[in-house]
């Protein structure tokens, strides 16, 4: 789906109409995901991971066990990677595709502001990714009820942190997408940044600055997604959530201003 921008002679500004257009962009993006292969591929990957972990516990372990947190930990330890893959698929190409395909000059019913395009695409990628996160946690919670027979409240804290981490990663994905010229390059760089680059920067900071607790780094804060499920670890859930949200807001704002300055 392609979108256009308001022409220079159009001075009217209707906030409600801009939100309506953003909603249309969001629906079109989600429809595009559903009709394409990305949604199917990621759904299959998510189902495969759940199946493999469950099979491994059944065949080589003690089944689902009797401890809800231990069981949750085994499934949630892959969550950061799942979010990373989802952001690479759904967020990293959202903005760059408009420039790469040269389709953003096409109008649907009337011109549309760039911020409506940005907001619609951001919400679409966020909703799809968070949707998968919720489904994944719902399955884990169900397995906890089937196996141990109860659900510890820590898993809901972990869920909240996973949603915050998704938001933070989406901001990074859009930031990279706003300056790239090719979708493939944007996807690779997004994956590399979230999987390796931030961790490399984290290591340098810890060594060079002698900082033992770099709580302000996005990927470091993501550790609390698991730590809240492990009584042997010290988790700072509120701080981690704040760090993730700040990363998401800051990177999203920067990516919007970069996107707004680019010409279609």
Predicted regions and their residues:
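Short hydrophobic, aromatic-rich alpha-helical segments embedded in or entering the lipid bilayer
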Residues: 21-24, 209-230
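Junction motif at the cytosolic side of a transmembrane helix
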Residues: 2-6, 246-264
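Secretory targeting signals
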Residues: 13-15, 43-94, 118-192, 198-199, ...
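Hydrophobic alpha-helical segments typical of transmembrane helices
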Residues: 91, 102-103, 221
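A cytosolic-side transmembrane-helix exit/cap motif
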Residues: 155, 174-177, 204-214
